[in-house]
Structure formats: structure tokens, C-alpha cells
Amino acid sequence: MKLKIGDQIPSFSLKDQKGNIRASNNLKKSLVLFFYPKDDTPGCTIEACGFRDKYDLFKILGAEVWGISNGSIKSHLGFANKNKLQYPLLCDQNNILRNQFGVPKKLGFIEGRVTYIINSEGVIKHIFEDLLNGCLLYTSPSPRD
């Protein structure tokens, strides 16, 4: 089932690139959660670096940024260090959370990209399927709305 605006996100607890647990039930701020296909690929690097470059804007708007793919902790750590990413990359190695969100595949086999704006109560407020561009258009009102 594909999640839509107004839906409650599923409860999850995943490790990030440093081995820290990130859990949906600990949200204290709005969350920009972006699903991407794979570490160290051209499109994913552009996407991740775009969030890196706009990270301060998201913080000003009161939002955390988390990336998520099926890469390992080691892969995520290398990708984050190489590109100086200051936000967590979560490991969804069996695509369980990706499937719970209903993130579609492209061409039937390439993991898709979707960005969700989620409020602190875990409700999806906006969905963008156009890399970072759509998410960056959402700068006012704040992601809390």
C-alpha cells in the first residue's frame, strides 16, 4: 500500500551510518525523509549533496533530514564521509520500510526516490517524487504545517 498525505507513518527503528538507532516514535521535530536507490551513484550523490547544501535551511524551518536506502552501515558511512553529509543515512537493508511506505520502483527494478515531509506526530504532510527539487519548493509555510 502506498502511503499518502494525511497517513500516519509506520513505526520504525533503524540504524544510521554511525550505528545509532533512529526511531519514528522519537520525533521531536518535523522530518524530511528521503528514500534514494543507492550510495555512490551519480543521481543519488546529487540528491544527497543537495540535501547537504540546504541542510541549514531545513534546520531553520524546524525539520530534521534523514536519508534512507538499503545500503549497509559501512556503505552509508563511506558515502556520508566522502560527501560530507551532516545528516543520518538509515539502513533499510531488506527494503522493509521502503515497502511499508510504498515507494515505487522505476522501470520495475530500480529502487525509486520519494521525499516525505512528516510532522512531529508522524503524519505525512507532503510527498515529492522529483529528487530534491520538489522538496526545496516547500520552504514556506514551515514543515510543521
What name fits each language-model region?
Residues I9-P10, S30-V32, K106, G112-V114:
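Short loop/turn microsegments at loop-to-beta-strand junctions
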Residues T41, Y138-D145:
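Conserved small/polar residues in nucleotide/adenosyl-binding loops
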Residues T45-N83, I96-L97:
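Structural microenvironment flanking redox-active thiols in thiol-disulfide oxidoreductases
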Residues N26-P42:
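Short active-site neighborhood of thiol/selenol oxidoreductases, capturing the structured segment around
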Residues Y116-P141:
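Thiol-/selenol-based redox modules, centered on thioredoxin-like
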Residues M1-S11:
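N-proximal helix/coil linker or "cap" segments that precede and/or mark the start of modular domains
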Residues S13-S30:
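A short beta-strand-turn-helix
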Residues W66, L77-G112:
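Short, internal strand/loop/helix patches
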